[in-house]
């Protein structure tokens, strides 16, 4: 992870006048049926039994080292809202995942975070669910948190992440297309939400977890931005899954290869960022 962070930091410096990168340091992995590796917070050493106490320490240490040793800011998924207090002083960007976006606690906690919170559409693809979550996060809330009654002022930086969907037949339905983007922008306008901002998640159900498809998705989205001024103004980022080696593996045997979702390797990542930079510089 730190080797990847060092490379990303060097690349960030090359493109800093057009691109701002936040490194995904995802430490908890949601599981559809509860099985499988659940991330650093659960199992900091994959050769040993799960240990949440050691995992929480490892999470803080990893975020801290990435930030202090590379100068990058970090992002993490807020899978467990109760853990926010353990990383709130370190993490600069929080994501609410597809399986959590409809949950009231996630929405209300997001309303009290003083950092951007990206909210993904649910796996069904229902944009209304996601926008209701953003509305809740952008407004004042009163609720119980860590055994205390808390009030929030709302988070004006809560925004959209489009990650694709799965239909009732189990087939992927991408939602980074031109018409979907315009639909999302119209919903932003109709609901009067602040700071309209859309991130495209280039993996997951947009790519069908075919990690090389991320390159095509980025290219098509950049074209859509060129064709429509509203899209250009609102679609302002990508969430790209990348690591040192292409693909994924079941066990940590190959250095720098993901043991969760398949990722772009470093060479492809660097080339893609440079391509984005060149497109934005035209």
State what each model feature region is.
Residues 200, 265:
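Conserved, mostly hydrophobic/aromatic
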Residues 2-187, 204-220, 224-237, 242-252, ...:
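Active-site-facing alpha/beta catalytic cores
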Residues 250-263:
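Acidic, Ser/Thr-rich peripheral helices and adjacent loops at domain boundaries
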Residues 194-197:
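Short, structured loop/turn "capping" segments at alpha-beta junctions
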């Amino acid at each position: 992870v730190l080797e990847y962070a060092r490379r990303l930091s060097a690349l960030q410096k090359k493109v800093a006048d057009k691109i701002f990168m936040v490194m995904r340091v995802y430490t908890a992995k949601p599981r559809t049926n509860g099985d499988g590796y659940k991330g650093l917070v659960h199992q900091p050493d994959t050769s040993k039994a799960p240990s949440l106490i050691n995992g929480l320490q490892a999470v803080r240490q990893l975020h801290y080292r990435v930030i202090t040793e590379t100068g990058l800011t970090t992002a993490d998924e807020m899978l467990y809202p109760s853990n926010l207090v353990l990383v709130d002083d370190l993490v600069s960007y929080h994501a609410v995942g597809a399986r959590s976006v409809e949950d009231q606690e996630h929405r209300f906690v997001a309303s009290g975070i003083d950092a951007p919170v990206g909210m993904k559409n649910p796996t069904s693809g229902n944009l209304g669910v996601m926008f209701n979550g953003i509305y809740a996060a952008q407004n004042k809330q009163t609720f119980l948190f860590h055994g205390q009654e808390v009030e929030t002022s709302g988070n004006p930086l809560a925004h959209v992440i489009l990650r694709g969907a799965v239909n009732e037949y189990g087939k992927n339905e991408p939602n980074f297309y031109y018409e979907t983007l315009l639909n999302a922008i119209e919903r932003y306008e109709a609901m009067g939400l602040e700071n309209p901002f859309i991130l495209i998640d280039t993996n997951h159900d947009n790519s069908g977890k075919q990690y090389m498809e991320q390159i095509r998705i980025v290219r098509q989205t950049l074209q859509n931005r060129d064709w429509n001024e509203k899209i250009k103004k609102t679609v302002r980022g990508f969430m790209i899954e990348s690591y040192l080696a292409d693909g994924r593996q079941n066990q940590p045997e190959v250095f720098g290869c993901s043991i969760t979702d398949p990722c772009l390797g470093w060479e492809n990542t660097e080339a893609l960022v440079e391509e984005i930079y060149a497109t934005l510089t035209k």
